Amino acid sequence: MDLGIKGKVALITGGSRGLGRQSALALAHEGVDVAICGRTEKSLSSTVTEIKKLGVNSLGIIADVTESADIGSLHSEVCESLGAVDILVNNAGGSLSREDIEGTSLEDYKKTFDLNLFGGFELMKLVIPQMKENNWGRIINIASIYGREYGGNISYMSAKAALIAATKHSAISLAKDGILVNSIAPGSIEVPEGSWERFQNENSPDVVEGFISDNLPMGRFGWPEPLGDLVAFLASNRSGLITGSCIVIDGGQSISMI
């Protein structure tokens, strides 16, 4: 299937590894020029090399999405090197604590929002004007099933729920401008150096097997390729009637009916 996005420009935050890397590769397979940002030169360089082997232009930029100055510089460098951003994937995120409300400081709560919500919000504001001018744009925010139902810790759950809400509001606001805005809610997907790999390394086989038995109907952790394929589809011309949606990709893990 030709997704019709060859020659478009994508920016993926947290794109050097994990789900961001898989999203970058999936878009590159469709002929998209891809810029990624991350915090370490080594992982950025490795992923950029992989992307370029697919015959597209690629750029790796060291940036911290919790810093407004980095966000502005990131956007400017992508536009100067590859052109205006057609596809934005806000993938950078994570959890800074494992605590409930009593064990979570306000500082950690704010930092979790900086990482999971505010950085993506700033980038959306930067790319939207050119998308409106082109009457075409795609914004994909990587949330979590724990933004839809109970799970994880209070700061992460709250931030991902806010990201889903911001996605819905933005989608409706921009629907007449040719800009589609959606979120993806992954479940427990295992990637190298990711949280679920750490979970398996830090716990006994009995604990891991118990978690899988209790929570994962497929009997295994998820894998990243389906999410990358979903990102590519949502970024494409084939997704023209999909906006404001939060698409769950969790192998049946969620217990919510909606």
Language-model regions, residue ranges each:
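Conserved glycine-rich cofactor-binding loop
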Residues: 16-18
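Substrate-binding pocket helix/loop in short-chain dehydrogenase/reductase
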Residues: 71, 99-101, 108-113, 208, ...
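Short C-terminal tail/terminal secondary-structure segment
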Residues: 95-98, 232, 243-258
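Catalytic Tyr-X3-Lys loop
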Residues: 102-121, 136, 140, 163, ...
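Alpha-helical segment proximal to the catalytic Tyr-Lys
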Residues: 129, 172-173, 240
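Catalytic loop of short-chain dehydrogenase/reductase
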Residues: 140-162, 167-176, 188-189
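Short, small/polar-rich loop/turn modules that mediate ligand/substrate recognition or access, typified
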Residues: 175, 180, 242-244
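A glycine/serine/threonine-rich, flexible loop-to-helix segment
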Residues: 176, 188-215, 256-258
